[in-house]
Structures are given as C-alpha cells and as structure tokens.
Amino acid sequence: MGFTILGTGSALPERSVSNDELSEFLDTSDEWIFTRTGIKSRHVCTTESLDDLAVAASERALQVSGIDASQLDLIVCSTTTGDHLVPAEACAVAERLGATCPAFDVSAACAGFVFALDVAEGYIARGRAERVLVVAAEQMTRALDWTDRATCVLFGDGAGAAVIEAGGDSPLAVELSTAPDVETLRVPGLVGTSPFKASADSASVLSMNGRRVFKFGVNAICDTVHKLAIDAGISVEDIDHFVFHQANERILGQAVKRLGVPDERVVRTLRETGNISSACIPLALDRLANAGALHTGDTIALVGFGAGLDIGGYLLRWK
C-alpha cells in the first residue's frame, strides 16, 4: 500500500541574518560567501525554540491537509538539534498539537526527512497507521563555531512538515544507503563528567571536511537519482521536479550539470535559508507546493545526504 501527501508546511525564525552582518565579526564578505556557497542570508532563532518551529510547520501541514491532530496515528520527527535529548522532539510536537498517537524521532542528519518518510511509509504498509505527520526541524546555529567562517556561514534554522495518508502510488522508488564515515561531518555528543572516566574539555560544535562533503554530495545526488529512475522504470528526463538537500550551490550546480536536467526543474531555497540540515527537503517541497508548481501526476525526486554518511532518495507521485 502506498501513500499520498495531503499537505505540507514550513516555518522559519523571524530573524534573517545577511552575509554583510556576518562580515561584521568574521573575516569574510558577502562576495566571498555567496561565490563559494550561493547563500545570501539565513534565518536564526533568537526568541523561538526548536519546538516552536516544529509545531508551526506541523500546524500548517495539518491545516492544508484538513486533518485534526487527533486523527493522526503517528508522528515521526527528524532532528539532530533538539531542544532536549529526551524526550523526543516528536513528543513535544504531539503535546502542543494535542495528539495522543505514538511519537518518536529519527536521526539521520541531513538525510533525516527522507528516512523519517520511509519509517512512516513502513507503518502505513503494515497497516499500523493511516495518517502520519512527518516533520523535520533543525536549529543548526546552536551547533556552530561562530569564529569558523568555513562552517558557520553555511547553516540556518527552520522546519518543514508533511502529512501523509494511506492510499496512492507513492513511493514509486526508494533508495536508502550508508557509506560509513563518522569523521567527515560530525558534531560531538554530550560533554559531561563521571567519577569513573577521565574527561577532556571538548566543544560540541560542528566540524566538516568540505572537500570530502563536496565529492560525496555530488555523487550521492547523481547516483541516487539514476537508481530511483531505474527502479521506477522511467528515465531521469521523465522526472518533473528535483528536491535535493540544500548543502551548497556548487554541489547542486555540479550535480545538475552531470544529470543533464533542466535547471528550472531543480528547487532551490539555499540563497535565503542556508543549509538547515534535514529541514531543507520538506521546506523546499512546501515552497514548491505553495508556488502552484505541483500538478496531479507530477513525479518528484527527493534526495538527502549528510553525516554518517547517510543517503536517502524517494521518488514520489503528486496527487
């Protein structure tokens, strides 16, 4: 049994920070950042919590879907930057929405929304759920070294969500994989003390090997799109829309060039949002839907890639 996307939603913090503002305390400039990343600004939480963003995106998706939270059978949330390690971010969303269904998180870094969508589809396929809220919310700016211009200029905060319902022919194809590598892109875990183990001070901030990420990202997008098309029995040219993880414009540009697809079929939100990890894909999907660009029968390729190194691809049919 497949599913249909009933509605989408997204949310961004009110505060938008431009490249020029970053140049006030970093050795950088708008030109330096934009030419290397394609980013002009990013949204940053000031008064908002991650719970606020996740709930706002979820409420919008429910509103568009015409579904009340009490009708949900499951909530799956993708995040690596939750307001709390426990309970799950999904539980906070459920509480504020007034839902009483099972709720839990999935952690697969920037590929997380696709993995969460696959978990939701599995519940539907087994008859365990009929309506599922899938949400991705990230506050990446809390995990950055704001003195490191190579990383802090890339990321922002935000959330995206989708409500799916049993019935329909999505997914047409699924590709999930992991190329195990825990050093290329990582954020250290808890820094605590224990009388039984010597502890060294360590800042819990993101570190990244940019060159490795570039090569990995381009290959992940291209290989996954080709696999999705083959599995669905169509050609890459038959895919109407491409929603890729918004990591860096150079990655997107190189991937689009290699795939040979029209640039107008590729959704881009990077310029004004930066990289918001797993929230990139659902936010971009919501932008696409709000623009009136999606029509019944359209095919949409979602491809996320990130730390782990995890890769997630989904080929959907819009209805």
Spans of model-derived segments:
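Short beta-strand segments
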Residues: L6-G9, S78, S107, V132-E138, ...
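Short acidic, glycine/serine/threonine-rich loops at helix termini
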Residues: S16-V17, V86-A88, L144-D148, I311-L315
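Condensing-enzyme catalytic core mediating Claisen C-C bond formation in acyl metabolism
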Residues: M1-T47, D148-K215, N219, D223, ...
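Flexible, glycine-rich active-site loops centered on histidine and acidic residues
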Residues: A125-A159
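Short beta-strand-loop/turn "lid" adjacent to the catalytic site in phosphate-handling enzymes
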Residues: Q71-H84
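Phosphate/pyrophosphate-binding loops at sites that engage ATP/ADP/AMP, CoA/4′-phosphopantetheine
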Residues: A57-D73, D223-D240, L288-A293
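Claisen-condensing/thiolase-fold acyl-transfer catalytic domains that form or cleave C-C bonds
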Residues: V55-S58, L62, T81-G82, A92-E95, ...
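Acidic-glycine-rich active-site phosphate/pyrophosphate-binding loop
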Residues: L26-W32, H84-G98, V134-M140, G192-S199, ...
